[in-house]
Amino acid sequence: MPSRATVQEFSDSYPFCHNGFRPIMMPKIVSVQHSTRRHLTSFVGRKAELNDVRRLLSDKRLVTLTGPDGMGKSRLALQIGAQIAHEFTYGRWDCDLATVTDRDCVSISMLNALGLPVQPGLSAIDTLVGVINDARVLLVLDHCEHLLDACAAIIDSLLRSCPRLTILTTSTEAIGLAGELTWRVPPLSLTNDAIELFVDRARRVRSDFAINADTAVTVGEICRRLDGVPLAIELAAARTDTLSPVEILAGLNDRFRLVAGAAGNAVRPEQTLCATVQWSHALLSGPERALLHRLAVFAGGFDLDGAQAVGANDEDFEGYQTLGRFAELVDKAFVVVENNRGRAGYRLLYSVRQYALEKLSESGEADAVLARYRKHLKQPNQVVRAGSGGVRY
């Protein structure tokens, strides 16, 4: 018969199993360090926004950050999660749904974020409920907009069954649940945060970039022209390796005159981002554009092997040449670098990927790129997680 100490040690190892009614081998929730995503660029500004949302989360169990693409919803949510994780007994864990295309895979993707399998005889949602139970946990659920019904059903079930769970979501629109509090993410402050972000990202590609009386005015005008949209500012700042702020502003003004003329009225934030992507894309070299278009076949994250597999084409450049061009796309903010569970990963932001997919379709090489993509997925070491989706045209 096991000693009392042994029984206590086993019980402590499975804090989510209570009263003898949960499956005895229900796994323990993973630690914070194993369930979080880390960006490799610094988080800039948003002090007031961070304080506002933190205050909301102290009182509400479901808060949704809304706003158009490129406004920084994901970065804000992850930063808030990092700041308040210590307030939750079992920390926080993140689930990015950007790559999930099947509503039935949402709960499975959440288990994947925890690094947990579905328990035998239980559905994915029942496994989640059993794992979380009455533990105090923060769930950051990112990119819910294309799976609103599925997310609503799962979130409702989790909140009803897990009384100490708090959920922070991001979406272009509200989830639509009773008790949900929506908070629209604003543009960056044009007097401080937007300029600070531009300078920070400019120094990633040009370490000697300096702000003085002259450049401060121009950079401020660039940020104003871009309506304080973070992604648009990052794309523009990445051009300081070859263009001066004055040249960047002139190029943006030319592009926005076309957009405003077509719209017939003021340019919306969505149009601001689209125009900035188009302008920055036009400044890429031919091989860089070709590689970007090919990378768009990845609906979610990928690694360097994947980039080489789909990017290399004997007719224009080979696999070893892909790395240099890939590095240029990272420097120019077209490819996002993330540290996920200690491993470097890459992805395209939604608006960039959608534009690149259009260009890939126009190029006439979509079928060939898709063939290389499928061949890569069949390699022995490639594992496609549930819900990773496919190519979405």
From Swiss-Prot:
SUPFAM superfamilies: P-loop containing nucleoside triphosphate hydrolases. GO terms for molecular function: ATP binding. This is Uncharacterized protein Rv0894. Keywords: ATP-binding, Nucleotide-binding. InterPro entries: P-loop_NTPase (IPR027417). PANTHER family: HTH-TYPE TRANSCRIPTIONAL REGULATOR RV0890C-RELATED (PTHR47691:SF3), REGULATOR-RELATED (PTHR47691). GO terms for cellular component: cytosol. Was identified as a high-confidence drug target. ATP binds at G67, P68, D69, G70, M71, G72, K73, S74. It comes from the Bacteria.
